[in-house]
Amino acid sequence: MNGTSRTGRTIVTGAAGLIGSALVWELNRHGVEDAIVVDRLGRSDKWRHLVPLRFSEYLEAEEFYPRIAENPNAFGPIAEVYHLGACSATTERDATYLIANNYRTTQDLATWALGRDARFVYASSAATYGSRETDLREDLDPHSLAPLNMYGYSKQLFDLWARREGILDRIVGLKFFNIYGPNEDHKGDMRSVVAKAYEQITAEGTVKLFESYRPGIHDGEQTRDFLYVKDAVAIALHLGRSKAAGLYNVGSGVARTWNDLVAAIFTALERPKNITYIPMPDALRGKYQYRTEATVDKLRAGGYTAPFTSLEEGVWEYICRYLVPGLTLGTELPSPTGAGSARSTPASR
């Protein structure tokens, strides 16, 4: 990961969130302990995610952005900026808020980073693909994409702007697919199905999944591209420290069913599988995606060769080392082998 020769500090926005805190954790594993981390902690408990992590300075977003606007050199030489801070709620209806928070702020930060000769890596989203279910490639005509919600559109707006401004070949956009893992407890209804199903199973002994309304696809056989958060940040750091440019899918490249996901949760909890299929709300039926699967050819061609954590391995680690004991990333229980990674944990015990 030495494709760039820049010197200076690292900045991570959204640093207390699911992906942001995992990225700071990954930076720590690579010996980086002087990052500047930025977020909006508010009244949530996501501050707990920062406690075991090592960094040099924390700033609230409302302090950080005015400081760099007033003095672009406020933090000295900057080597890399990982912009993961955004409103990620696909149900958010305030378009004005999403434009300001997800689009304008990203424009301002990208302009500042490039002006400082810093590497700029930002969170785009697989939501930009809209209802498309096949051939999810990064080189698709961006104007052919139609996001299904305002969140996805706010991300697409920046992708389009970066292309128009001619800077997409100097920065990296990460199209995250279905990311799950520790440190998502603050996300409420936007948590992964792993977290929500874990709660359902421990409270009721069953998991509710939507019925299928597409001929040939049975209930629970709808698929998603699930990716463990530790893989997601390993990819982000690889791309940030390589000569990569443009948009990259961040997924496993393998579509798995909701039934597969839930079965892995029951296995991790050593409970018998018990799934209840429920009707899908009418408002959702017309725009529900029955399949997502990232193409990862560009990622592999960009030199990322590490294997992806299997769904069974990732779910087992997330549940047994984090959710059950109630721990955050960096405070986890040791793995059975002591290796500390999902890949060292057997898919079944």
Predicted regions and their residues:
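N-terminal Rossmann NAD(P)H-binding glycine-rich loop of SDR-like oxidoreductase domains
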Residues: 10-30
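Catalytic helix-loop patch of NAD(P)-dependent Rossmann-fold dehydrogenases
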Residues: 100, 104-108, 115, 119, ...
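C-terminal substrate-binding subdomain of Rossmann-fold SDR/epimerase-dehydratase oxidoreductases
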Residues: 201-349
